């Protein structure tokens, strides 16, 4: 178990000090294959909507330091071992903040609701935007549906050609080395 509210309160000032905005702080199963858990932190540079690898590394160091300091003073933020994962939200990013629903209006999204509306819990269609705390989507099956932000269990963009065109990568430096490393590990 983790105190996500306290973790967010510790992490957000560190992200802001670097000029970044938090997109999500979440505990999830680790991708390390060890059956453990991971503290996933997604952040973005508001100017680009992305983070470079160097920016992720810088935020990771800051977050590690602030969590270590809190735990050394006796706080229990996360029970048990965990991995820290800091990343950019990616192209098919989660939609977690009101501004996400405004910024990505016109793009296809998948939304899972806490409770059914008009017989549907899962929706997929064009995000029409947000008005106050009410999100509207043109669902492929149910038509235009509106619901409160608090009714959303999860939401994310769907990878489409339109979305790819709207989110060009900032920097591909080092990408070939990463691919080569993966190929070498696969050959081992």
From Swiss-Prot:
Subcellular location: Cytoplasm
A Gene Ontology biological process term: translation
Main location: cytoplasm
KW Cytoplasm (keyword) present: yes
Record flagged with keyword Coiled coil: no
Listed InterPro entries: Ribosome_maturation_RimP, RimP_C, RimP_C_sf, RimP_N, RimP_N_sf
Pfam families: DUF150_C, RimP_N
Alphabetically ordered keywords of this record: Cytoplasm, Ribosome biogenesis
GO cellular component annotations of the record: cytosol
Family as reported in the entry's similarity comment: Belongs to the RimP family.
Described purpose of this protein according to its UniProt entry: Required for maturation of 30S ribosomal subunits.
Protein name (record): Ribosome maturation factor RimP
Gene symbol of the encoding locus: rimP
